[in-house]
């Protein structure tokens, strides 16, 4: 043994341990002209609008990759990604401001396909102000 040496067990590391077994695999395509990168803890539902995928399936989920990692989508890239549900209190704040509260199905509202302001209502049951103005933060 050398001074400062760290000896670790040679076992597999299980990521997202304790998450619900409802893993979701979706196909994502970058329809924009710039690369887009999505981090491990980002609410995938709120990912860049240059990514085309079934956003409803991504609601309340993040990428099933190690913490700190990310997936990069080059222009025109199409890949399958695996998503897992958030654990804990299941409240999401920030990102694009589409949720800003609990992620439960009762709060979800839907608008016409392709509408840029699709998201969820706030805790008071009102549409988030950013959706009324069209500002996606």
UniProtKB/Swiss-Prot annotation:
Transmembrane segments: none annotated. Residues 113-137 are annotated as: Disordered. One of its GO terms (cellular component) is urease complex. Pathway: Nitrogen metabolism; urea degradation; CO(2) and NH(3) from urea (urease route): step 1/1. Keywords: Cytoplasm, Hydrolase. SUPFAM superfamilies: Urease, beta-subunit. Its main location: cytoplasm. Its EC number is 3.5.1.5. The keyword Transcription regulation does not apply. It is found in: Cytoplasm. Pfam families: Urease_beta. GO terms for molecular function: urease activity. Belongs to the urease beta subunit family. This is Urease subunit beta. It comes from Staphylococcus carnosus (strain TM300). The lineage of its organism: Bacteria, Bacillati, Bacillota, Bacilli, Bacillales. The gene is ureB.
